[in-house]
């Protein structure tokens, strides 16, 4: 079991930072990679796992601290898993609104029965940059893609992701509830279990 007093979170994404800090709680002091560098590593992996490890190693190298990275995205069944690892850059880096518009356009003629999707999160924790045994935890949240945006909470694809067990979009959930149900919450629960938190 790894004992952590502090770690660096390998993300400049304010939404992810807020979610993951809330999930980790006060037992571990979380610092942002932004305290050490504004440069993000090139995500050259072909999977969420590869990119999470790459980001964690980079953050550990820059900070000298244990590092936690999240690589996550939306995998839409009808689109063969796209946008997948390219979720944040789906509309050529033009932001959440453009990503959502592109997804709605790609799905406009898709019947309801074929709109299944999953939010996927892979957390990678490394003790140091050359850690030969990263801890990997995966969370998957099943849902479907709506025909229009709904809700004002969250970020990314949350307004388009229907949560069947709550009969609403992810963006209609209170942040506390999303932090209990989401793909990141599922991955974080596994990580906390592995760390004995």
Swiss-Prot record:
Record field: catalytic activity: XTP + H2O = XMP + diphosphate + H(+); dITP + H2O = dIMP + diphosphate + H(+); ITP + H2O = IMP + diphosphate + H(+)
Matches recorded under NCBIfam families: RdgB/HAM1 family non-canonical purine NTP pyrophosphatase
Entry similarity comment: Belongs to the HAM1 NTPase family.
GO CC entries: cytoplasm; cytosol
Identification of the protein by name: dITP/XTP pyrophosphatase
Organism: Pseudomonas aeruginosa (strain ATCC 15692 / DSM 22644 / CIP 104116 / JCM 14847 / LMG 12228 / 1C / PRS 101 / PAO1)
Keyword set, alphabetical order: Hydrolase, Magnesium, Metal-binding, Nucleotide metabolism, Nucleotide-binding
Active-site residues annotated for this sequence: 71
One GO-annotated biological process of the protein: nucleoside triphosphate catabolic process
Pfam families to which the protein is assigned, alphabetical: Ham1p_like
């Amino acid at each position: 079991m790894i004992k952590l007093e502090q770690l660096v979170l390998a993300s400049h994404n304010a939404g992810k930072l807020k979610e993951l800090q809330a999930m980790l709680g006060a037992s571990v002091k979380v610092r942002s990679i932004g305290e050490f560098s504004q440069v993000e590593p090139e995500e050259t992996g072909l999977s969420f796992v590869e990119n999470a490890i790459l980001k964690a190693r980079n953050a550990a190298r820059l900070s000298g601290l244990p590092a936690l990275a999240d690589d996550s995205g939306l995998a839409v069944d009808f689109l063969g898993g796209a946008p997948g690892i390219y979720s944040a850059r789906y509309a050529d880096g033009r932001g959440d609104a453009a990503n959502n518009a592109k997804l709605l356009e790609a799905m406009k003629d898709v019947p309801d029965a074929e709109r299944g999707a999953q939010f996927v999160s892979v957390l990678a924790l490394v003790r140091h940059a050359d850690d030969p045994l990263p801890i990997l935890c995966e969370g998957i949240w099943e849902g479907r893609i709506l025909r229009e945006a709904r809700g004002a909470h969250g970020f990314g694809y949350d307004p388009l992701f229907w949560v069947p067990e709550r009969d609403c979009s992810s963006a209609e959930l209170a942040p506390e509830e999303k932090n209990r149900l989401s793909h990141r919450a599922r991955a974080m629960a596994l990580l906390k279990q592995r760390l004995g938190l």
